[in-house]
Amino acid sequence: MTAPLVVLGNPLLDFQADVTAEYLAKYSLKENDAILVDAKSGDAKMAIFDELLQMPETKLVAGGAAQNTARGAAYVLGAGQVVYFGSVGKDKFSERLLNENEKAGVKSMYQVQNDIGTGKCAALITGHNRSLVTDLGAANFFTPDHLDKHWDLVEAAKLFYIGGFHLTVSPDAIVKLGQHAKENSKPFVLNFSAPFIPHVFKDALARVLPYATVIIANESEAEAFCDAFQLDCANTDLEAIAQRIVKDSPVEKTVIFTHGVEPTVVVSSKGTSTYPVKPLDSSKIVDTNGAGDAFAGGFMAGLTKGEDLETSIDMGQWLAALSIQEVGPSYPSEKISYSK
């Protein structure tokens, strides 16, 4: 089964729980941040997963940023329109992810690791904020040859979405898709995903950037990019940062910076536009975890349908607004159709 949209990312099971500021402080964690932990390193933060499993209110939710985006795009496009690549373990966690994707209409092309468990992410919620602690597990072992085995799906795709978290796993796989996209004039969308990506994985990001025709990031990730790449502008000036990325790009590029409830900033060679976020009563906000993934899902659905940039961004904002009224990175069980 081929599909117009191919997504590459790190499939994870989210352990989601409400915690206190003191709990974050206990592990030196920050609100609205994302970090990686390694089970083999003896990192004290690995204890978080066991602690969350002991909490009766902890919810297990299918996650992984790009996988959330894939399900979001499928929510809009319908079944059979999205293929998702990533690596999982042979365990009950991956079965759960597979079932969630099937229900959402996403075709899962998992590379299965027999001896390594499926990755997991602790989503620690404080009010309307979240802090993510990720043990990549099997997600860390994706290899480009898995794409080769399913290259017919790549060739049939019309556009690609790459989760920036995958830069920590296989930049080679991203480049392989990027080269195909470039040679065949297909849109190639890259999400920065987290502030640590430009800082810690700067070389991998620099290697992949030339292939991206669209960049998506939030204000924290834009600031991190500005600092890591030493741009000569204020790290809070989203428009200036985006303009530098567009100016320095060897390909025509559109940069989209989301900023919570502040207007979305969009810069291309044609100029700068801002798109106000429609206000949502705070009493309706249930959970902001995955809001950025939902924005990307709605946006990618718009591109896949052939909508213009303005409509695609509106679809992203619309889907993000739906998602934050649900628990976890998910969407209403009853299908709601987009309308301007």
UniProtKB/Swiss-Prot annotation:
This is Adenosine kinase. Disruption phenotype: Results in a severe reduction of adenosine kinase activity. Keywords: ATP-binding, Kinase, Nucleotide-binding, Purine salvage, Transferase. It is an enzyme of class 2 (transferase). GO terms for molecular function: adenosine kinase activity; ATP binding. Its EC number is 2.7.1.20. It comes from the Eukaryota. It comes from Saccharomyces cerevisiae (strain ATCC 204508 / S288c). ATP dependent phosphorylation of adenosine and other related nucleoside analogs to monophosphate derivatives. ADO1 does not play a major role in adenine utilization in yeast. Its physiological role could primarily be to recycle adenosine produced by the methyl cycle. GO terms for biological process: AMP salvage; purine nucleobase metabolic process; purine ribonucleoside salvage. Pathway: Purine metabolism; AMP biosynthesis via salvage pathway; AMP from adenosine: step 1/1. GO terms for cellular component: cytoplasm; cytosol; nucleus. PROSITE patterns: PFKB_KINASES_2. Present with 22200 molecules/cell in log phase SD medium. Belongs to the carbohydrate kinase PfkB family. Its cofactor is Mg(2+). Pfam families: PfkB. It catalyses: adenosine + ATP = AMP + ADP + H(+). InterPro entries: Adenokinase, Carboh/pur_kinase_PfkB_CS, PfkB_dom, Ribokinase-like. The active site is at 293.
